[in-house]
């Protein structure tokens, strides 16, 4: 110990440990032995124990984890965490143009959108981990959240504090040989990926083996499971790592002009970024970068499942904007899925929630793409015929998109004499109803409708899923029990369940039953968009349900709409419109809807854009920046959208108004630069009231 007072010594120790931590986990160039780091760490621990008032949120001692949580709190992302669209390459195509046709189409769309002959792209590895958001205020990590559904994630701040490569405090870092120093912004939101290095994954599985516990299938599953531990001490023991790949917000500073320079800027703040990055020009540069990254894949210390390309200039990104839930300026180029040989032991069919009959190959277990595969989809009867798959065949199995296993092809020369062809059954294997196939459809369907328990189960699972009514605690196994016990036949039956009936189910118990009843009661209050999505109408996904709710405003208006009226809604074509008309034309479906409403399912009134439009707001694009005196950001956004306006996250020539509050940052500067009208809160409220 030194003669310094405890406050000064603690501050000095924290600064030293932050520096040594950055050298070890980010720069991979430690300047002191592990024993010296451990000695200083123990000294700081002892100081904070003796003087609790010295403990701080950015102390390295916070990395060891704290007391377990009861549950994770929800976090609404100020800017949605969007996913990327994917492109694939057919590496079996000998023609280079055909091999990368999807990538070429992406490049063409970007060039067309920008009016350029050639575009500069930033290239990065596509990490195979878990997307997270980090928020720093005045350099201190104050919040960490998972991506969740893109709009709402889970608050995993305490767990992320245990990840050694994540700085708890940003510094005006001096930089290193590769990266320049940077200035800490007042508020910074960084997006990145939490993952587990291959060596740490092997170590974890060795520990699982020694403890007699189940092994993790792959590093991604291990990372996701580790980050979502309610006990942060478990997360701390798992040796996760982090790489930043985007800036969502940076208040009080001007970002560099390009994405690649922005990544260098983050590195200057002490945040870890990938060193497998490059900048290329045009399609030839993209394909070359892809081939190079594919060749590096096996030798990298972490798993990647593709390459990410982003238009490098941020001004060009802003011009291209977004479509649905993905940016137009970026794409993920997925690697070819891993393949393996195995034998088809049987071909059965499974029944989907809409009655779709899907042939499934039952396989001799085979390890593909990090998991053991025993089943593979054959899609439909025509696909089985086209690939000529027989029971007994040796086949090549691939994890398409590294997610869904599929049979790619048959090694016909290995077909045994006793191999037998697949015959589509005439009746549903679950309920015995006839299987029918329309002349213009590839998919056969069970005609049993809601009489078929397989459809009951999958329809109920969809109804209760996170993006639908989000019934906490109602998973696949419990749905199976409820249907098999005859307690639930339609979604409306869920709301008639009581605690005594549920408690009698296997492995439920009084507390679990009480929690489910409470969760169901909470789900009675939802939104029209979620309700429409929960009905499971064919071809109506989450985004379409949201568009329908905004366009029609009420369920009655939606149910009464004919095909032509439906096609006036955004992104609704004839196929989707036909599905909606057919769904509500079925009397049983209307009975289910009526029963749900009678059970108390309700939502706030949704005002349509046309009915709520305010002159001066409707059709205009707004950007919010800084802190408004009385309106929260979500409240301001909701009021603008209710009046027919649109709120975006970045300022461009298409922006009509920038609403600026206290501590407005670079967005305000950009507005002045482009000559865009700037409003304060009072002016915004006047505009919304139609008084401007």
UniProtKB/Swiss-Prot annotation:
For this chain, one GO molecular function annotation is: metal ion binding
Keyword annotations from UniProtKB, A to Z: DNA damage, DNA repair, DNA replication, Ligase, Magnesium, Manganese, Metal-binding, NAD, Zinc
Cofactor dependency: Mg(2+); Mn(2+)
Q: Which gene encodes it?
A: ligA
User: SUPFAM superfamilies per the record?
Assistant: BRCT domain, DNA ligase/mRNA capping enzyme, catalytic domain, Nucleic acid-binding proteins, RuvA domain 2-like
Q: Name the SMART domains on file.
A: BRCT, HhH1, LIGANc
**One Gene Ontology cellular component annotation?**
cytosol
Q: Which reaction does it catalyse?
A: NAD(+) + (deoxyribonucleotide)n-3'-hydroxyl + 5'-phospho-(deoxyribonucleotide)m = (deoxyribonucleotide)n+m + AMP + beta-nicotinamide D-nucleotide
Report residues binding Zn(2+): 428, 431, 446, 452
Q: What name appears for this protein in its UniProt entry? A: DNA ligase
EC class: ligase
Task: Enumerate the spans annotated as BRCT domain.
Answer: 612-692
């Amino acid at each position: 110990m030194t003669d310094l007072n405890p406050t000064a010594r603690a501050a000095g120790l924290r600064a030293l440990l932050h520096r040594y931590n950055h050298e070890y986990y980010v720069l991979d160039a430690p300047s002191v032995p592990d024993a010296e780091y451990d000695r200083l760490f123990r000294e700081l621990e002892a100081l904070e124990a003796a003087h609790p008032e010295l403990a701080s949120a950015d102390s390295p001692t916070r990395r060891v984890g704290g007391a377990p949580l009861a549950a994770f709190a929800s976090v609404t992302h100020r800017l949605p965490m969007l996913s990327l669209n994917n492109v694939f390459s057919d590496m079996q195509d000998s023609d280079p143009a055909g091999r990368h046709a999807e990538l070429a189409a992406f490049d063409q769309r970007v060039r067309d959108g920008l009016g350029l002959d050639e575009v500069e792209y930033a290239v990065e590895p596509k990490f195979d981990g878990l997307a997270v958001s980090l928020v720093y205020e005045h350099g201190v990590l104050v919040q960490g959240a998972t991506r969740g559904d893109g709009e709402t994630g889970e608050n995993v701040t305490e767990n992320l504090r245990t990840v050694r490569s994540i700085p708890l405090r940003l510094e005006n870092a001096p930089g290193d040989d590769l990266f320049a120093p940077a200035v800490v912004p007042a508020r910074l939101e960084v997006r990145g990926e939490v993952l587990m290095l291959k060596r740490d994954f092997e170590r974890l599985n060795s520990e699982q083996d020694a403890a007699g516990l189940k092994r993790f299938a792959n590093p991604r599953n291990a990372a996701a499971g580790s980050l979502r531990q309610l006990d942060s001490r478990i997360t701390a023991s798992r040796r996760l790592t982090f790489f930043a790949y985007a800036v969502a917000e940076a208040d009080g500073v001007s970002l560099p002009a390009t994405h690649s320079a922005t990544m260098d800027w983050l590195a200057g703040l002490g945040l870890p970024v990938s060193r497998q990055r490059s900048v290329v020009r045009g399609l030839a540069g993209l394909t070359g970068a892809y081939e190079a990254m594919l060749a590096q894949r096996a030798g990298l210390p972490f798993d990647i499942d593709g390459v990410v390309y982003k238009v490098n200039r941020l001004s060009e990104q802003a011009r291209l904007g977004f479509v649905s839930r993905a940016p137009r300026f970026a794409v993920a180029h997925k690697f070819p899925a891993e393949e393996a040989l195995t034998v088809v032991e049987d071909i059965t069919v499974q029944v989907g929630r809409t009655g779709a009959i899907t042939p499934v190959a039952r396989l001799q277990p085979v390890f593909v793409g990090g998991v053991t595969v025993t089943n593979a989809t054959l899609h439909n009867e025509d696909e089985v015929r086209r690939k000529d798959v027989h029971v007994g065949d040796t086949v090549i199995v691939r994890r398409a998109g590294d997610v869904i296993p599929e049979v790619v092809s048959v090694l016909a020369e290995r077909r045994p004499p006793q191999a037998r062809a697949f015959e589509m059954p005439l009746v549903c294997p679950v309920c015995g109803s006839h299987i029918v196939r329309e002349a213009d459809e590839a998919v056969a369907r069970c005609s049993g409708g809601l009489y078929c328990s397989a459809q009951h189960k999958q329809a109920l699972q969809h109804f209760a899923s996170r993006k639908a009514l989000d019934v906490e605690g109602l998973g696949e196994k419990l749905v199976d029990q409820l249907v098999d016990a005859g307690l639930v036949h339609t979604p409306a039956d869920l709301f008639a369940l009581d605690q005594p009936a549920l408690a009698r189910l296997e492995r439920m118990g009084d507390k679990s039953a009480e929690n489910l009843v409470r969760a169901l009661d909470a789900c009675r209050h939802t939104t029209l968009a979620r309700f429409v999505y929960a009905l499971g109408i064919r071809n109506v996904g989450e985004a379409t349900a949201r568009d329908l709710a905004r366009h029609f405003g009420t369920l009655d208006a939606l149910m009464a709409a004919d095909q032509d009226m439906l096609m006036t809604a955004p992104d609704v074509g004839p196929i989707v419109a036909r599905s909606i008309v057919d769904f509500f034309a079925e009397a049983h479906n209307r009975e289910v809807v009526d029963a749900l409403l009678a059970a108390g399912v309700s939502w706030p009134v949704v005002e349509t854009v046309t009915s709520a439009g305010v002159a001066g707001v409707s059709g205009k694009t707004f950007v919010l920046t800084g802190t408004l005196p009385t309106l929260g950001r979500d409240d301001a956004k909701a009021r603008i959208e209710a009046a027919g306006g649109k709120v975006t996250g970045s300022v461009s020539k298409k922006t009509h108004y920038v609403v600026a509050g206290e501590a407005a940052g670079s967005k305000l500067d950009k507005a002045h630069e482009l000559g865009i009208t700037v409003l304060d809160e009072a002016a915004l409220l006047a505009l919304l009231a139609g008084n401007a």
